[in-house]
Structure formats: structure tokens, C-alpha cells
Amino acid sequence: MNVLFLTLLDLENLNDTGIYHDFVNELHFKGHTVTVVSASEKRKGGKTKLIKSNGIDVLKVRINDITKTSFIKKGVNTLLIEKFYSKAIKKYLSDRAYDLIIYTTPPITFNNLISNLKKKYNAKTYLLLKDIFPQNAIDLELFKKNSPIYQLFRRKEKKLYKISDYIGGMSKANIDYIKNHNKISAKTQIIRNAMYEQDFVIAEEERKQLIEKIGIDPSKKIFLYGGNLGIPQGVDYIKAVMSRFHEIENSQLLIIGNGTHYNDIKSHAEKLNNKDIKVLSILPKNEYDKVIALSDIGLIFLDHRFTIPNYPSRLTSLLNAGKPILAATDKNSDIKDDIILNGSGLWNESNNIDEFIQNANMMLKSEDFEKFKENAYQLYNKEFRIEKNIDKLLEMVAN
């Protein structure tokens, strides 16, 4: 089967690991011919070009900046991406035909492109639902429901669902939400934020070097948050956790990431002057994976205002590494149901700091701490292996 995969991520090096890298590589491994269309931002010196990576054709498309820019510019530039992708596909892929077109949200602005490609190739269309926009922006009060920008993006969202033959959501709540708020005719299924299994083992010498480099106390438990630091993660709540982290016994907090509020988080840590709190900018993946191996408990944060069920992708690596999960999210995300029902962690709503402190201390003292670790890995093994998820996807498309 010839597969066209459209994404906003930069997938130039498919020898790397990640949600989308592994997704594309597993399709290729199963014998399908995959072409990736991937963004290349202007600020990074992006150029439109067709390359081969790990045996897969990758069409890099130069786009205007959609990261590290203002909210307005990001919105305008996102609307323009469809035009850039259409032009590049016509120029570089005009002699090809595809049986299946797979695309992700974000963005929701590819409806015309997908519709045209679907007609041209008589292809099946599959949406990987990773984001429910524009409702998430309404939840965070970035704009109002009666605004023209909301109406514009909402129309595009509806059209994208309408032209999709199949929709794979990250969790049951994802699928339920779009069905309850839209007319969905597509076949639906759960496709997790899945990855190949990694070996999260760190050699003793590497452990010592990392401990010294970061400046952590090896006698204390490490709570790790890694990922984006922006409005969706509930920055004020994260700062409240930092302010009261001294109430968590014999522990240290390690925050690694980037985003619009990284400097805010970093500044707050400096004001607190708590030697048990470290804030670092984003690390290379191989080094960050070693930090995961070194840590004891993985943290998940989401803003409590969300009415849409987000499902952070950073959970996957933590489960794979067998790390108990302490999650503070909105009540609509079913990440809480997965970690609680599978005995792999604890949850509280992210407007309750007392309960977070209580859960953290409870987890540390629990006789079941080792069981939490074992259950975390078992949840990865059951739900988050890329091989199983690609098999599910291909089975649905074949029927």
C-alpha cells in the first residue's frame, strides 16, 4: 500500500525515535511504501526539498514560523501552511499515487488539501486526532466562541472530520468527545501515542556523571517533569507545586523543557532558592532518556480549565521506563482513569495543591511503590507499543 503521511513536525531524520518517527517507520517495516510531508520553519533555515531518510521519502516544506512566535502570527501562518504543502506536493510528488492518506491534528487547516488529494488518488483518508482545536483555545480563554477566528477554525474542524474515512483518537474520551460535539460518519478507534520499546537502563558511570552535571542529591527521590512549559500545562499550578515542594519528604523536583513560560518557571525557581528544585532547558533526547532512567516518579500537568480530554504524549516514555505517574490534570482527561485503573499512579485535579502534596507523600511511603513501577510498564506493554497500534490501524483500513 502507498501511504502519504502529512505532519507539522520536522521529520527529517527518521533514525530518531518519537511518536511520529516510530509510526512512520513501523508502517515502512510492515512493507508499505510511505512518503512523509513534513514542515521546515523559516526561522530554522528551512528549505523545500525531497530527501530520503531511513529508506523513506521525506518532502520537507518551507513554512512561515509557527513556533516561538506570537499567538496571532502563529494563527495566520498556520492558515498558510495548506497552500505551501499543496504547492510542494504538486511540484515534487505529481507522478505518484497513494492508497491511504494519513494526517494529524494539529493542524485542522488541511481540509481542502486532503479533499483534493482524496479525489485525485481515490484514496482512503485517516485522521490521527492529537488535538481538539479550537475548543482547547476557548478553554484557555485565548479567544471567545463568538469571535470570527473561532468560527473560521470551527468550520475547518468540522470539514476535516467530514472528509475523514477513519479517525484514530488517543483515548476513549477523545473519541467520545468528538462524537458528542460533531456529526461523525468516520469509523473510529483508539490509536495511542505509541512508540517502540526503549531500554531505559543507565550505566553506573553515566549515572554518576549525570548526577554531578545536574547537581542532584542521589539520596533523594526524583520527581521529573519533562516537556512543554506553556499555558496548556497550567503554569500557575506548576509554580504552586514548586512553592510547596519542601512539603514533600526527602525529594527533589527536576523540570526539563521549553515553551512560552520556561523563563517564568526558571525565574520562580530562582526566587524560591530551593536546592531541591532544578529547572533545565530542553536536553537532547538521548540525554533526556538517561534522566528518565535516573528519575523515580514521572509528572503530568494539564490546566484544570480544559473541557476537552487532552492526553499528553510524554506519558509513553515514562510508562515504558516503568515510572509511577503522579498526574495533576483537568477532570475531563481520561489519563487519570488509565493510570488509576491500571494501578500505575495517582491523580488529582490541577486546582488542588493540597491533594497533590498528599498524593506525592502517599506514593513515596506506599508499600506498593514497586507495584506502581511494574504496573506502569505493563500499561505501556498493553496499550502503547507502536507495533500493536499500527496493526490495529491497518486492520481497520483493510476492512
What are the residue ranges of the model-derived segments?
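N-terminal subdomain of nucleotide-sugar transferases
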Residues: M1-D57, F245
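Conserved donor-binding/catalytic core segment of Leloir-type glycosyltransferases
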Residues: L4, D217-Q233, I238-M242, L254
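Nucleotide-sugar-dependent
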Residues: L14, Q233, P284-V291, G298-L319, ...
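Carbohydrate-associated surface elements
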Residues: S40, A173, A194
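A short helix/loop element that forms part of the nucleotide-sugar donor recognition site in Leloir-type
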Residues: T48-I51, V201-I216
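Membrane-proximal helix-turn-helix segments that form the acceptor-binding/catalytic region
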Residues: T109-N112, N116-K120, P148-I167
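Nucleotide-activated donor-binding/catalytic signature segment of Leloir-type glycosyltransferases, i.e.
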Residues: I248-N250, I256-G257, Y262-D289
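A charged, aromatic-enriched C-terminal amphipathic alpha-helix characteristic of glycosyltransferases
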Residues: N351-E355, E367-V397
